[in-house]
């Protein structure tokens, strides 16, 4: 589809790129702090019905704190955090980061993606909201979707520590600075730690985007993600379904830099590019 505007109209699950925003929600609501650790066995069991939500790394990440959960992209950590979250507060928080709304003043017919809520699910699917829906939202999967432009906006929002002008392709002399309430409640030290953790995604030997370290000569903050198109239980199952190119996961990343004073923020989606 060469004439389809994927940047403004393509919908993709944000996947693990959402984790810095979820982390800041947990900090803001005092559900966790930076030293809060869990034992990650590679899965999370939903207490209500014993349903198992699996992480991407078999065997898990062991004992892991918030910073390393971002660097290593621990699904179990964020499953656990999302489970403790109030869905209405969480969706309001994510809306401030650009999800589920039009953030581009001069894009042609932009898609706003989907930021799911209990009200949306009842109105569109005629089902109530389950705690498992919130758990999925914690890792950017499930019903949620976003456009690459929204992801770039989100990346810039993180880079600017919650201060951002309305996205526009035309340079304006007088730009209105926007600082949503949720961002104003986040401390400077927490923004610094988010940046440090996202730098670790590339710089730390355990970072999920460590392969990019050899390709650059400056420091960049990033968060990678894998958009699952077909749900599978094991790597062996995935090897079978990936024989069809259209079943392969999308690769996704947000980034900003050069650090510590970023000038550029980007998002990249590689369809069926895998992790």
Residue positions per predicted region:
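Beta-lactam-recognizing serine transpeptidase/beta-lactamase-like catalytic domain environment
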Residues: 1-16, 21-270
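Short, intrinsically disordered, charge-balanced linker/junction segments flanking boundaries
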Residues: 272-275
């Amino acid at each position: 589809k060469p004439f389809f505007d994927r940047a403004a109209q393509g919908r993709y699950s944000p996947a693990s790129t959402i984790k810095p925003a979820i982390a800041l929600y947990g900090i803001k609501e005092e559900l966790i702090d930076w030293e809060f650790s869990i034992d990650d066995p590679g899965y999370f069991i939903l207490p209500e019905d014993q349903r198992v939500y699996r992480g991407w790394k078999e065997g898990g990440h062991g004992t892991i704190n918030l910073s390393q959960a971002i660097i290593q992209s621990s699904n179990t950590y964020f499953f656990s955090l999302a489970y403790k979250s109030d869905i209405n507060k969480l969706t309001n928080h994510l809306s401030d980061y650009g999800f589920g709304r039009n953030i581009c003043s001069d894009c042609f017919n932009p898609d706003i993606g989907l930021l799911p809520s209990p009200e949306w699910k009842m109105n569109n699917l005629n089902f109530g909201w389950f705690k498992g829906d919130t758990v999925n939202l914690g890792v950017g999967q499930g019903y949620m979707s976003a456009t690459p432009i929204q992801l770039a906006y989100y990346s810039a929002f993180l880079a600017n520590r919650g201060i951002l002008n309305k996205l526009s392709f035309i340079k304006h002399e007088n730009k209105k600075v926007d600082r949503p309430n949720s961002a104003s409640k986040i401390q400077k030290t927490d923004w610094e730690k988010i940046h440090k953790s996202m730098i670790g995604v590339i710089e730390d030997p355990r970072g999920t985007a460590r392969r990019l370290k050899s390709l650059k000569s400056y420091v960049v903050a990033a968060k990678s993600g894998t958009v699952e198109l077909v749900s599978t239980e094991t790597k062996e199952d995935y090897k079978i379904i990936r024989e069809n190119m259209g079943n392969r996961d999308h690769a996704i990343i947000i980034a900003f830099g050069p650090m510590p004073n970023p000038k550029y923020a980007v998002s990249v989606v590689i369809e069926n590019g895998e992790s």
